[in-house]
Amino acid sequence: MTALMTALVPLANRAKEHSMQVVGVVVTYNRADVLGRSLDILAHQSRPLDHLIVVDNGNDPAVKTLLENAGATANNGTGMAVTYMPSQHNLGGAGGFALGMLHALALGADWVWCADDDGHPDGPDVLRTLLDCVKRYHLDQVSPVVCTIDAPDTLAFPLRRGLVWRRTRDELFDDDDPQHQNMLLPGIASLMNGALFSAHCLDTIGVPDLRLFMRGDEVELHRRLERSGLKFGTCLATAYLHPNGADEFKPILGGRMHAQYPDSPAKRYYTYRNRGFLMAMPGKRSLLLQEYARFTWFFLVQQRDLAGFREWRRLRKLGRAEKLYRMP
């Protein structure tokens, strides 16, 4: 606790450089090899962060060193307040962001900017651009476009608008806006990957659900955001770079629909369990028949995988019954 409190002193004592206090929150787990680049870019934004929190689910001393170095060299050497929060218990992405967000609010944050450990903002002006978008469109929450880290014109995750799947950044703009004047995609946001939340937004929708651990906790938070009546969206003028995750969305029916099939048993466990939980929630129940149709077709018709279908059903039943056990 002493080390944590010492880290908080610089934020409490120094004069405010901006009218709004923006606190960054990063959650990491055993990725010190790639975390350093993310922290370096976060620490050198043209609109500087006022404080940076790292929640370390791996309790790795190397992460603390990376954070301290980022804080010391931030903003052309003027420095930045940092807080390292090691966890003896793996909280998952959901619990890690919940802890970090609550701590940011306790510090007095007006805005909380989230980032993960294997991605990073696309340059030094991302935070400034997001805040400009907030002001222009009067937003309570805004996210950048999430693009593939080694192919920035490609979306890291496909996005469906109506019946059409969008896979490139340019496809997010409206057809009647060839000059790209409108910089907001309203009502849609990728949460955690560069997502910026106002304190008012978090007071209204809460923080991620610890029980979900990972895989879908951001979708459940998005559900709350949709139902809150708050104004939010994606700022098309800036991006967050992330490893491509499109491969786990398997096309079915000639590409008209997709079924999510992650590449590891752990990812499948939490994805399908959490989707069972999510589909039982207000605002998502209308999608249940579509969910059954997609996965029945994928497992039984396309893959001919009866065992996989049974496991999908078992896991979604666990989630629907709120038996949100950790994977054995």
Predicted features along the sequence, with ranges:
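Short, well-formed alpha-helical segments that are part of the catalytic scaffolds
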Residues: 31-45
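A conserved acidic beta->alpha catalytic loop
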Residues: 56-67, 89, 119-120
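Glycine-rich, basic loop-to-helix element that forms the pyrophosphate-binding segment
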Residues: 87-107
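Short beta-strand-to-loop acidic/aromatic patch adjacent to the donor-nucleotide binding site
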Residues: 109-118
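Conserved donor NDP-sugar-binding/catalytic core segment of glycosyltransferases
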Residues: 124-158
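A recurrent flexible, glycine/aromatic-enriched loop bordering the glycosyltransferase active site
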Residues: 177-197
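A short, conserved alpha-helix in the catalytic core of glycosyltransferases
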Residues: 195, 201-206, 211-238
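Non-catalytic, C-terminal membrane-associated alpha-helical segments of glycosyltransferases
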Residues: 279-328
